[in-house]
Regions:
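Short, charged, surface-exposed hinge/linker loops at domain edges
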Residues: 1-8, 37, 41-75
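Structural detector for hydrophobic anchor residues on beta-strands
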Residues: 8, 19, 29-31
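Short aromatic-glycine-(Arg/Gly/Cys) micro-motifs in beta-strand/loop hairpins
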Residues: 11-23
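Short stretches within intrinsically disordered, low-complexity N-terminal or propeptide regions
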Residues: 23, 33-34, 48
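Proline-centered helix-kink/hinge sites
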Residues: 24-27, 62
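A short, exposed loop/beta-hairpin motif centered on an aromatic-Gly-Thr core
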Residues: 27-37
Length: 75
């Protein structure tokens, strides 16, 4: 039986030479790539791999809880 789909918040950061991504609701689930497109693909794979590992270890899969919001400031 296939589980329901989940949507996790992914934070993508641009560094001096690459992009990094992490998932706040899945501690340790990270990816890095040379482009935004690459890091988006890699974090998708990392999330799937992370969840597979949790299930294989008999651990619960965390429900997505994190959200994001932009805040306007006068600068």
């Amino acid at each position: 039986m296939r589980s329901k789909g989940m949507q996790y918040l992914v934070v993508i950061e641009r560094g001096p030479t690459s992009y990094g991504a992490y998932v706040p609701d899945l501690p340790g689930c990270i990816a890095a790539g040379e482009s935004r497109e690459e890091v988006e693909t890699l974090i998708q794979e990392a999330i799937e791999f992370h969840i597979e590992g949790l299930r294989a270890d008999g651990q619960p899969v965390p429900e997505p809880k994190s959200t994001s919001q932009f805040v306007h400031v006068d600068a």
